[in-house]
Each structure stands twice: as C-alpha cells, then as structure tokens.
C-alpha cells in the first residue's frame, strides 16, 4: 500500500491536533467536579464513564496523522494505568501541556533535542522532590481517604479500607457484580497465584483481557498435556453438564492447546488453561494446596494416577475463577474446612521444623494464601450503565490505594505538582534550549490544578496564582470550594500515581517534540458498485 509522508512543522501540527482532541475529551473528567463522557458501544447501551484510560482507548480519529497523535497520548495514559492503576487523566493533561508549550518553542526555532534534555532534567528533579514530600500510609483512615478521593465516594473509601484491613495490604481483593443494588464486602476462602492464561483467545472479557469462570471444574495435574485424547472423555462429560473448566498443568503443548482454544472459540465450552505455579517440589506442594482449597485431587504419578483415567469427582470446584495474563484468582473453593485446616497444620509444622530462612518465607507465603482468604467487593446499582460506571470507579480506587501503600501519598488536587515547582526552578540548563525544556515542565506542572479549578467553574489562573503563594500542602479543595491543608482534609494522591503520570507524560511529549516525519498509509479508494438497470435492487 502507498504511503503519505509529512515533514517537520506539518507533521507536528497534525500530531498536535490529535493530542488536543483526545486530551480535551479526557480532561473534562478530572477532579471532584469533573464531568462524565458517554461512549458509543458497537452493541448494547452506551457507556457513561469518567475513567481516563477507558475514554482514551475508545477514541479513534478519522485523520490518520491526528489519530497517531491521539494514540501516543493514550499510550501515556495506558502506561500510567499499567504501573500505578490510576492517574490516567493527570497523565493526559500533563502530556498535552508539555506538547503544546514545546511545539510553540520548536516552531519558533528551538532545538527539540535540547528541549528534550531539559524536560528530562526537570522531570527528574520533580520526581525526586515528590519522594521527599511524600507521607507513608500508616492508618486505616489514610487508606480510606486515598480510595475516597480516587472514587469521589466516602462509602467506597470505607469499603476498600475494610477490605484491606481484613485480608492485609498484600491480600487478594476482587470486584464482582452484585445481584442487588447495594455495594457490599465479603471475605471468602480463596487464593491467587502468579500464572496467567496460555492463550489470549481464552479470555471472556475483551475490555479487561481476562477470563471469568463461574462455578467451574478444576483439573489439577503436574503432568504435561500434549495429547487431547488423554482428557477427551473427561471433556465430553464436562460439556454434557454445561460446565466451564480450568486446567492447571505442568504445560499444555502439541495438539492439545489449539484444540482447547478452537472449542472455546466455537462456543463448545468455556475453558482456560494455566501453567502450574512454582517449580520442582514446591510446585507439587502448591498443587496440593490448590487441591485442598477446591476439593480436588492432584493427578500425579506419585499417587499412581493417570490423566486418561481421571473421573469428574477428582476435579476441584470453586464459585468463581478470574484469570489474567499474569495471575489466577480462585474464589470460594469447594474444599472442606477439615481438609484446609489439615493442610494449614501441615504447613505450620513445616515452618517450625525448617532451618532455611528462604524455605520459611516460601512456606509462610503458602500459609497466607490458604488462611488469608479473598475479599470480594460486590458492586450493586440500579441499572447496567450505572453498574459499569461504579465498577470503573471502584477499580481505580483499589489501584490507587495499593499505589499509596507502595510509595506513600502527597497532597492531592494537583497541589503536590505545584509544590515541587521550587525544586524544578533550581535546575539550570546547560544551553538555552535545555532551559526552555525546564521552563516547559515548570508551566506544565500547574496544568492539572488549573483544569480541576475550571471543571469546578473557577478561573484556573486565579486559583493557581493564589496557590503559588501558599505554604506546602495548602490547596484548593474543589469539592467544598475552600482553601485548606489538603493532607489534613484527606485530599491525597498516591505518590506512585503522581510520579508515574509525570514521567510518562514527559516521555511521550519528548518523543512527539523530536518527531521530524510522520508516515501514514494512503487508503485505497473504494471501488464503486456497478450501476444496475431499472430492475429491483440487489439483496444483501
């Protein structure tokens, strides 16, 4: 296919148009007075959301050059979401601010490479200062505040704080749809291990790229499955019962994996395959843990069991299983309390007898998985549209809270980014262009607070001017229209979220500013259908 190429100013101007179209859509959602965006769906009702990354991913522009600019900003949002789980709108606002200011200077004749160096220096100084002014998360109230700010709901904040209190900061917390209108928390037997699906064609939710299985059977084995005939009788029985299946095996190779995938795609039955966790003897022990939790039997030669002889009553069961590309979460396994308690006692005795610190650590991890349980947040709402929107907010809040536990928190509402301006001003560029790059980041740091104020119906410049004359952590609370200490008021952002948003915005913006040519495909003209006579129109 033929290509069209744009150079220098023309290329950058087209990219900037795409950046602006996406950012102008996303930034309306930032802050407590942010608006919602309605997204058309290919089928069903439209989605209503204020989740930055969801909006960014859904935007596809008609102009190919503009679309490339939009997609690069969406990448900054997506990377921020992948690392920190939140802050996608902040990343988008910062990217637009840096790109816009940078484009003006490049057009005026500044060297984009020098500007890039200045942007990198300023970003490093800002990130270092963020870590210096960061507070550690030490109480349940602080956890609740982080979650409440992210979700714009004190009820959600309290719910997530309760969940973390019950299963620990590193515990497994999952989010499910409720059958009622209330959002509630429950703790059930369950565990999570670090193994994901063997094929992305096994996913059931394409938006989140995860596979959800309700009331599935679980085949647990330490063997490799390469011949589908070994498990065919078992599969046929599962299909007849209309059940789904999770296979945990050493590996699935040969014809077995494509056969399972084909049956999943055709809708014969819902199946997900994952590799067994751990290695060597630890793998066998972990499989026994899973068997105890789910009421299944490990199919292993150690017990004289063969795959081809496996019966349905040797399979484990659970109320729900969620598999992502990296992990598998088993919720509410069907194992008896006696079997689980016996397994727990065995592991505790092994911990007492162990002389190796490494072995003790691994045994304690297994013990925590068996005894800690899984916190399940059941999200309720009156309509499906409201349910989706509420679920997005709770997922963001949970991710924010985990990020705050990792790296602490700073004053929210864009206040922390303005507070680090002083440290950035102390950075001096070696050249005029470097200094220009530093100044670009300086101006961009105030973009989130401006936008939060404007979304609340205030003049962003007036709010910013007043903020720059306040002490650290004193900021504008857009929710109450008051000036107060943001940390004391519970308006806090995870340091990890703020840091990641700034770093990704600076990285993508620097790439855009140093772009000299853009190549796009020229779409082939559609061939017009031959004109018919005066007869009847053709059918589909």
UniProtKB/Swiss-Prot annotation:
<dbReference type="GO" id="GO:0140662">
    <property type="term" value="F:ATP-dependent protein folding chaperone"/>
</dbReference>
<dbReference type="GO" id="GO:0051082">
    <property type="term" value="F:unfolded protein binding"/>
</dbReference>
<dbReference type="GO" id="GO:0016853">
    <property type="term" value="F:isomerase activity"/>
</dbReference>
<feature type="binding site">
    <location>
        <begin position="86"/>
        <end position="90"/>
    </location>
    <ligand>
        <name>ATP</name>
    </ligand>
</feature>
<feature type="binding site">
    <location>
        <position position="413"/>
    </location>
    <ligand>
        <name>ATP</name>
    </ligand>
</feature>
<dbReference type="Pfam" id="PF00118">
    <property type="entry name" value="Cpn60_TCP1"/>
</dbReference>
<dbReference type="InterPro" id="IPR027409">
    <property type="entry name" value="GroEL-like_apical_dom_sf"/>
</dbReference>
<dbReference type="GO" id="GO:0005524">
    <property type="term" value="F:ATP binding"/>
</dbReference>
<keyword id="KW-0963">Cytoplasm</keyword>
<dbReference type="InterPro" id="IPR002423">
    <property type="entry name" value="Cpn60/GroEL/TCP-1"/>
</dbReference>
<dbReference type="InterPro" id="IPR001844">
    <property type="entry name" value="Cpn60/GroEL"/>
</dbReference>
<feature type="binding site">
    <location>
        <begin position="477"/>
        <end position="479"/>
    </location>
    <ligand>
        <name>ATP</name>
    </ligand>
</feature>
<feature type="binding site">
    <location>
        <position position="493"/>
    </location>
    <ligand>
        <name>ATP</name>
    </ligand>
</feature>
<dbReference type="InterPro" id="IPR027413">
    <property type="entry name" value="GROEL-like_equatorial_sf"/>
</dbReference>
<dbReference type="GO" id="GO:0042026">
    <property type="term" value="P:protein refolding"/>
</dbReference>
<feature type="binding site">
    <location>
        <begin position="29"/>
        <end position="32"/>
    </location>
    <ligand>
        <name>ATP</name>
    </ligand>
</feature>
<protein>
    <recommendedName>
        <fullName>Chaperonin GroEL</fullName>
        <ecNumber>5.6.1.7</ecNumber>
    </recommendedName>
</protein>
<comment type="similarity">
    <text>Belongs to the chaperonin (HSP60) family.</text>
</comment>
<comment type="subunit">
    <text>Forms a cylinder of 14 subunits composed of two heptameric rings stacked back-to-back. Interacts with the co-chaperonin GroES.</text>
</comment>
<dbReference type="InterPro" id="IPR027410">
    <property type="entry name" value="TCP-1-like_intermed_sf"/>
</dbReference>
<keyword id="KW-0413">Isomerase</keyword>
<keyword id="KW-0067">ATP-binding</keyword>
<keyword id="KW-0143">Chaperone</keyword>
<comment type="function">
    <text>Together with its co-chaperonin GroES, plays an essential role in assisting protein folding. The GroEL-GroES system forms a nano-cage that allows encapsulation of the non-native substrate proteins and provides a physical environment optimized to promote and accelerate protein folding.</text>
</comment>
<dbReference type="InterPro" id="IPR018370">
    <property type="entry name" value="Chaperonin_Cpn60_CS"/>
</dbReference>
<dbReference type="GO" id="GO:0005737">
    <property type="term" value="C:cytoplasm"/>
</dbReference>
<keyword id="KW-0547">Nucleotide-binding</keyword>
